[in-house]
Amino acid sequence: MASHIRGNLTEEQLKRIEANRKRALERLQQKKKKDAGEHVPSSTPKSTSTTTTKETGSYSPTKTLSQIVNSDSVQVSSKFVEIETDGSVKKRRVLTEEQRQKIEQNRLRAIEIQKNLKQRENQKDDSTTSSKPVDNIRLNQNRPDSVVSSTKKFQPPPIRKQDYIEFDFATMKDTKGGFLQDEKTNTQGADEQTLQDWKNKQRELQKIRELPPPIDLQNIPRCRECQSMEVDANLMTNFNVRACRKCIKALPEKYSLLTKTECKEDYLLTEPELQDTTLLPRIEKPNPHGYSRMQLFVRFQVEEFAWKKWGGPEELDKEWERREENKVKRKEKKYHDQLREMRKRTRAEEYTRKLRDGKSLGERHVHDWSSPVNIDKHTIKRRCIDCGIETEEVVI
């Protein structure tokens, strides 16, 4: 009865109160040290921590992780975690063999890069010191390192002054001041030219070539029209046509030049006939409208060959009209074929639509009229819901 009276405590209760007081005091000290930034070791007393068993109600002492680690009798080690002296647990990183090899390779590569950078810096220092005058080297030795490092980047290269300049005229080339270029010379010899290059060169020479002066005045070539001795060299050399320049300008319907396209379209000549130079001589010039070379023919030679082929200008006109009619017929036939195909597709689509709607192919359409709409006083308008046809009815 005396133990339950206020103010009278047992020894066991006094011990518990004293232990709680000490524990609170230690917590307060740890908090102050933590706020001050000092390291706080684990200070849980071994003797003060007690547990009570349910069966007997007695108290048994317990130990924390730091007490177990600090104890001499227990050895704690793990492959995956590290336990510090203060009882904190850190996860240990486990590296594979491949990761270790990669780390070692990166370390060796970094060492090699550092060595190369040092060698380059040493070479730069050697080159700069060798190019500097002796007086500058002596003066720079007395200057502080900070000044030398700051002015090193902006120091201009040394100027080597000499009394004369040496030139090797054997290796010197005239560049024309950079404004003029030498004419392109053919580095290939005559034997190394292709056959097509040789033919093109010969054609160019034929265009420029002029007729030699006459030796025999009686047998000199004269113009076919006016018997003049001033024969055009181009027509005489390339087409074997004797005509002076005055007659060429006066008679363009006879001596003008025609292109290959005009010969095909106007005179209905074929490609093999135009390619045969024995039948129709020609000259070639650069085409201003494309990359292929332009072929030119004399008009009266083309007309003579066309009259011989078709039998005269009237027969040529008939052949041209016949080809134009055939061209129109082919165009109309193509149009009708396309129209027939379109009708077939439309009919097939109509059959497909009827089958999809569940109607037979031979079924007659019956209009499903909508309600009438009044247009004016005596006229109404109706519309089929299925096909969309509209009718107007007059109401009398």
From Swiss-Prot:
Chief place where the protein resides: nucleus
Localization terms from the record: Nucleus
GO process annotations (BP): base-excision repair; nucleotide-excision repair involved in interstrand cross-link repair; nucleotide-excision repair, DNA damage recognition; UV-damage excision repair
Region (Disordered): 20-101, 116-156
Chain positions recorded as Zn(2+) binding sites: C223, C226, C244, C247
Zn finger limits (unnamed): 223-247
Gene Ontology CC: one annotated term: nucleotide-excision repair factor 1 complex
Function: Involved in DNA excision repair.
Protein name: DNA repair protein RAD14
Native species: Candida albicans (strain SC5314 / ATCC MYA-2876) (Yeast)
